[in-house]
């Protein structure tokens, strides 16, 4: 399903302006650069304010004034990102924050077009990537060589004052010595600090391709002879500036800055005249300074303009003393639980690498004044991405949402789901599970590509219209492996990539199944059997067809994986899919039992996940009776169709494929006794062995619970593998029910002797035990009834055959009697004739 098309009513205007009346708060202008954007509402955002509205995990301050549906006025064209400033400019963060904040609020009312959401999120992500910090917590003594230091902006000695004057104006602009800098108070300087820094950037062309480049009107001659007092400060930029060549006459002036960079809200302009007048004068003075920057002969001004290309939040903004709070105070505003692990790792790796190249040797530990803001931005983008990815596919039907709440249960009914989902079960269940485990976000799967991929997978499963091996079976196996990952704790033993591979393998393990067995392909000499040399014919086809589908760009959900990640995922998926070949069942069980008997067994993850998927593939007899019986009837119907085809081709019937000669109940009892129950037992022991070291020790259970578990285990016929011992009950034939209690007691004693008390052993939930017992009981009752019915049918057939035989025997006797009666009558006639 496609998202709704963009229209003027689907969007929320981010008409937010930040009032600069309060100097203790961050000065930002968040809004559109259009002439129609005049009537705006004000909102005061402090340092600690979050980007998110209504979030309880991020502290928020009062003063927010969000738009209501009545004042939402946005056209579809205004969501374009072409009008936004470059990602490395000072106001890029504010613009991106306003954009995404508006998107978030709009999503609370109506849907937003996916294309607009994608463009704005991409812009916000690039803004975050442009962030880098060049400060440390170490204080400045007023004599450092860093021109970015706040004390250089407000120095009190003559040298510092001259630096201030040279940084704020060019040599062609006349200024009284010592007067300009001394007359500016810290408050006034802070009021126009962002505006003054924006002036230099606004002259460069605004693109999204990265830095706007250094000023092209700076002459190399000017840089060659810097002022002596600025010589130490400009050593770091001399080499890069010398490489530039003049492209303009020094007398030319650059274009005036856009009005958007100095636009103030109506609320700001109508504040107090005493505040507005100095601001206007400062803005005028800075406009003149920026206008004459093209003819600037002062190297400090060149250095200043080069610094303006650095994002505002990445430089020192400590001119306002209220913003010189400790970094720990800023970070304390963000709770650790509010930061997703992937965002935290990204922040740590990114900021650490960039700071390592910019900090001085004397710094012992880098301190980041803007980490808190970056974390908040990262949290916001992360949540927005999750919301977009979860709403990219159209909303799930209410009945589907209700049924998906039981997705974590062993008794999940996929047949009820397919009725509510109109047959599109792969689309809803696969998307739900990928989203629950975070695979969509972690591996950057585009929602549109994921939707197309799931649609093709569903088509592949429905291609041959199989009664059993169809999209329902794929979803059933995928939900079962989800239960094993989630409820047993197996997911804690795996990486994100391995979890994603497990879900993907379960989804694709029978992709494009033909509805026939491997033996049928071999016996009939099909093209698939010839292609794969009669070995795991269908399983090889499932894996090959799946990766052939993933190779197409419009269905490739693995496009953002690295080469190593793709190789690992492909190997794991292929191994798991090939492990579903039933011809390898007993060999697989034997190998795992041998590993479990070792004292210090090292079990490969591929073998573990292959066994888990294999058990999930044959697990329907371990589900509740209603689901299991329905699956059994569907599987037998598929077998019978193969038998009909074999009859047409003149091939012998495969087992259980003859409609007229199949013992359904007996076959299911044997399947449970010899295949399913031993497999589930081995899987349980394997999971308990590998998960025990990473799971907390279970507390001592109540005696009634232990007794209940012992009773439940005693009613099963599973071949239990005892860890760290060689005791394995025989699988040659089902155990006699008369000796079942004795055998179970012996197994319990053996367990206690090897593993100690029951309370100290790590146990996983085994809801299949009761289902297996119940299903076997019902099948046995059904077998008795079937035997009686067959006996009656046999008796009836025998009676009918006897009756037919008697009828055949009585018929010749009647003919003989008639012949004897006709002979005496003929004799008198002969005598009369004589």
UniProtKB/Swiss-Prot annotation:
Binding site for Zn(2+): 473, 509-510, 617
Protein name as annotated: Dual specificity calcium/calmodulin-dependent 3',5'-cyclic nucleotide phosphodiesterase 1
Biological process according to GO: cAMP metabolic process; cAMP-mediated signaling; cGMP metabolic process; male mating behavior; sexual reproduction
Occurrences of domain PDEase (ranges): 392-786
Enzyme Commission number(s) from the entry: 3.1.4.17
GO CC entries: extracellular space
Cofactor note: Binds 2 divalent metal cations per subunit. Site 1 may preferentially bind zinc ions. Binds 2 divalent metal cations per subunit. Site 2 has a preference for magnesium ions.
Cited function: Cyclic nucleotide phosphodiesterase with a dual specificity for the second messengers cAMP and cGMP, which are key regulators of many important physiological processes. Required for male fertility and male mating behavior.
Entry's family note: Belongs to the cyclic nucleotide phosphodiesterase family. PDE1 subfamily.
């Amino acid at each position: 399903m496609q998202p709704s098309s963009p229209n003027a009513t689907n969007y929320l205007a981010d008409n937010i302006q930040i009032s600069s009346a309060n100097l203790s708060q961050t000065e930002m202008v968040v809004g559109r650069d259009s002439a129609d954007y005049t009537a705006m509402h004000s909102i005061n955002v402090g340092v600690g304010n979050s980007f998110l509205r209504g979030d309880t995990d991020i502290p928020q301050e009062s003063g927010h004034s969000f738009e209501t549906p009545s004042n939402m006025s946005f056209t579809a064209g205004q969501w374009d990102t072409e009008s936004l400033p470059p990602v490395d400019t000072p106001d890029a963060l504010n613009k991106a924050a306003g954009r995404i904040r508006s998107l978030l609020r709009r999503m609370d009312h109506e849907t937003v077009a996916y294309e607009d959401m994608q463009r704005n999120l991409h812009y916000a992500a690039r803004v975050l990537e442009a962030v880098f910090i060049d400060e440390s917590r170490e204080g400045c003594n007023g004599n450092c060589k860093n021109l970015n230091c706040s004390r250089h902006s407000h120095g009190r000695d003559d040298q510092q004052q001259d630096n201030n004057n040279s940084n704020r104006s060019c040599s062609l602009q006349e200024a009284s010595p010592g007067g300009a800098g001394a007359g500016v108070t810290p408050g006034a300087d802070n009021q126009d600090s962002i505006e003054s820094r924006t002036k230099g950037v606004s002259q460069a062309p605004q693109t999204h391709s990265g830095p706007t480049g250094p000023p092209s009107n700076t002459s190399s001659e000017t840089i060659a002879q810097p002022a002596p007092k600025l010589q130490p400060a400009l050593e770091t930029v001399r080499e890069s500036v010398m490489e530039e060549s003049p492209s303009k006459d020094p007398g030319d002036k650059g274009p005036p800055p856009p009005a958007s960079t100095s636009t103030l809200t109506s609320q700001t302009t109508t504040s107090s005249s005493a505040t507005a007048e100095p601001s206007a004068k400062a803005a005028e003075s800075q406009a003149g300074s920026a206008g004459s920057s093209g003819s600037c002969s002062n190297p400090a001004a060149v250095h200043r303009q080069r610094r303006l290309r650095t994002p505002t939040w990445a430089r020192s903004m400590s001119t306002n003393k209220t913003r010189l709070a400790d970094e720990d105070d800023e970070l304390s505003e963000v709770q650790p639980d509010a930061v997703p692990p992937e965002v935290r790792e990204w922040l740590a790796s990114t900021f650490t690498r960039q700071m390592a190249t910019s900090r001085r040797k004397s710094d012992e530990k880098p301190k980041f004044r803007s980490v808190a803001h970056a974390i908040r931005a990262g949290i916001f983008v992360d949540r927005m991405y999750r919301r977009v990815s979860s709403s990219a596919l159209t909303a799930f039907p209410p009945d589907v949402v209700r049924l998906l709440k039981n997705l974590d249960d062993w008794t999940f009914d996929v047949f009820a789901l397919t009725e509510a989902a109109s047959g599109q079960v792969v689309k809803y269940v696969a998307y739900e599970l990928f989203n629950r485990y975070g695979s969509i976000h972690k591996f950057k799967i585009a929602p549109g590509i994921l939707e197309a991929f799931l649609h093709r997978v569903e088509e592949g499963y429905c291609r041959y219209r199989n009664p059993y091996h169809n999209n329902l079976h794929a979803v059933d196996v995928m939900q079962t492996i989800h239960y094993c990952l989630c409820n047993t704790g197996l997911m804690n033993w795996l990486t994100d990539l391995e979890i994603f591979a497990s879900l993907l393998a379960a989804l694709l393990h029978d992709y494009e199944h033909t509805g026939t067995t491997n033996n049928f392909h071999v016996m009939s000499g099909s093209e698939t059997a010839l292609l794969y040399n009669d070995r795991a014919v269908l399983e090889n086809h499932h894996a090959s067809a799946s990766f052939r589908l993933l190779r197409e760009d419009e269905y490739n959900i693995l496009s953002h994986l690295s080469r190593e990640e793709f190789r690992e995922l492909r190997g794991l998926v292929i191994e798991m899919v090939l492990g579903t070949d039933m011809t390898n069942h007993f060999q697989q069980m034997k190998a795992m039992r041998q590993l479990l008997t070792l004292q210090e067994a090292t079990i490969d993850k591929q073998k573990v996940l292959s066994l888990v998927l294999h058990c999930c593939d044959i697990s329907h007899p371990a589900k509740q009776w209603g689901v299991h019986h329905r699956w059994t009837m569907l599987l037998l119907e598929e077998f019978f169709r193969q038998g009909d085809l074999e009859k047409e081709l003149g091939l012998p019937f495969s087992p259980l494929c003859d409609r007229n000669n199949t013992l359904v109940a007996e076959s299911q009892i044997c399947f449970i006794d010899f295949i399913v129950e031993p497999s589930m037992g081995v899987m349980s022991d394997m999971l308990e062995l590998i998960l025990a070291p990473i799971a907390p020790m279970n507390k001592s259970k109540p005696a009634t619970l232990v007794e209940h578990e012992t009773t439940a285990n005693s009613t099963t016929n599973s071949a239990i593998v005892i860890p760290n011992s060689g005791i394995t009950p025989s699988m040659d034939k089902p155990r006699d029910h008369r000796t079942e209690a004795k055998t179970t007691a012996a197994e319990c004693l053996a367990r206690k002797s090897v593993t100690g008390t029951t309370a100290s052993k790590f146990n996983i939930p085994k809801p299949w035990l009761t289902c297996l017992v119940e299903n076997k009981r019902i099948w046995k009752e059904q077998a008795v009834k079937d035997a009686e019915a067959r006996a009656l049918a046999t008796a009836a057939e025998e009676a009918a055959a006897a009756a037919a035989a008697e009828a055949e025997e009585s018929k010749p006797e009647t003919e003989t009697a008639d012949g004897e009666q006709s002979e005496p009558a003929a004799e008198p006639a002969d005598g009369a004739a004589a």
